[in-house]
């Protein structure tokens, strides 16, 4: 999983600009990040990988946590 950053910076930027977030977004943190930053999009590529392959269960968990 990629490293994430201090999303307080993204919160400030997203008040003036559309933001797409990437890096370190997982099923464990996606809801908190989306609720605080309110991005127009997210890239969860590395956050849904297990052993360098996309993992169906991790994809489902991220989707479930966004509902």
Swiss-Prot record:
Q: Which GO terms describe its molecular function?
A: phosphoribosylanthranilate isomerase activity
* UniProt keyword annotations, A-Z: Amino-acid biosynthesis, Aromatic amino acid biosynthesis, Isomerase, Tryptophan biosynthesis
The answer on whether this UniProt entry bears the keyword GTP-binding reads no
Isomerase as a keyword? yes
Report the leader peptide range: none
Q: Which family does it belong to?
A: Belongs to the TrpF family.
* Protein name as catalogued: N-(5'-phosphoribosyl)anthranilate isomerase
